[in-house]
Amino acid sequence: MQGFSKKVQDVNNYSKVKGDLFIRLLNKKKHEKALENAVYKEVDGIACVLYMKVGQRDGCISSMKIHKASLADWGMDEDEAYENALANTYFLTPPRIYKWECLLFNPNYEGDDFMDMNYEENIVERNAGSCLSTSIRTNGAVAVFLPNVAQRIADLMDDDFYIVFTSVHEAMIHPKRIHWL
């Protein structure tokens, strides 16, 4: 991977950075000042922000927000850049459903690829609920905003659902028709 400073210098060259663009969530109200020049879409107070990965080491990612000024250099509008980064996020860190009890007792548990059309497990009947994240379990709360994810969860549950953002790394999924609440 290119060095940090080289990546930052290339930020205005879309062809060089497009594979490193992804979406990360921030609380819009809490990060209002930092979002002034950033590229993002708001969903109910959550800012889905365009970032660029500038480095990675020992499983940790260094990144920077993309500013609106970069879009002019890229020759694209916010919607196009956002949609491209959203798709890229999906492929870089695919969404996964984790059985809560497996997460607690098995550190090597990799979750279920519920987006696979052959996946048919009932995610409603889990006593502890289902945890939505990504394949790397980092910044996984973004998974619900990835293409077709919310619809797939609703289809698997055969119901609407509640989502509880427990951190930026995951969200708990519960069917609307929970009987034990």
Give the positions of each predicted feature.
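Extended, low-hydrophobicity segments enriched in charged/polar residues
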Residues: 1-124, 128
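C-terminal structured domains
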Residues: 126, 133-181
